[in-house]
From Swiss-Prot:
SMART domains: KU (SM00131). The lineage of its organism: Eukaryota, Metazoa, Cnidaria, Anthozoa, Hexacorallia. Negative results: has no activity on Kv1.1/KCNA1, Kv1.2/KCNA2, Kv1.3/KCNA3, Kv1.4/KCNA4, Kv1.5/KCNA5, Kv1.6/KCNA6, Shaker, Kv11.1/KCNH2/ERG1 potassium channels and on TRPV1, the capsaicin receptors. A synonymy between H.magnifica and R.crispa is controversial. GO terms for molecular function: ion channel regulator activity; serine-type endopeptidase inhibitor activity; toxin activity. PANTHER family: BPTI_KUNITZ INHIBITOR DOMAIN-CONTAINING PROTEIN (PTHR10083:SF374), KUNITZ-TYPE PROTEASE INHIBITOR-RELATED (PTHR10083). This recombinant serine protease inhibitor inhibits trypsin (Ki=30 nM). It possesses anti-inflammatory activity in vitro. It blocks histamine influence on intracellular calcium concentration in murine bone marrow-derived macrophages (62.2% inhibition at 10 uM), which can indicate inhibition of H1-histamine receptor (HRH1). In contrast to some paralogs, this protein decreases reactive oxygen species (ROS) level in the oxidative stress agent 6-hydroxydopamine (6-OHDA)-induced neurotoxicity model, but does not show cytoprotective activity on neuroblastoma cells. It comes from Radianthus crispa. The keyword Nucleotidyltransferase does not apply. This is PI-stichotoxin-Hcr2n.
Length: 56
C-alpha cells in the first residue's frame, strides 16, 4: 500500500518506542525508534505486521 512508501518519521516527541518501517529503497522492513507522536502510517509495532502489510 501507499503507506509503505511514506518516509520513516520519528516524530517530535521524545519517547523511545521500538518500531519497524518499510524501507522502499531496500524493500525490507527495518527497525527504528519512534518518539511517540507525530508519526505516519509507515510505523509498525512488529516486524510481522510490517511484512504482512508491505509484502516485504
Amino acid at each position: 500500500g501507499s503507506i509503505c512508501l511514506e518516509p520513516k518519521k520519528v516524530g517530535r516527541c521524545r519517547g523511545s518506542f521500538p518500531r519497524f518501517y518499510f524501507d522502499s529503497e531496500t524493500g525490507k522492513c527495518t527497525p527504528f525508534i519512534y518518539g511517540g507522536c507525530g508519526g505516519n502510517g509507515n510505523n509498525f509495532e512488529t516486524l510481522h505486521a510490517c511484512r504482512a502489510i508491505c509484502r516485504a
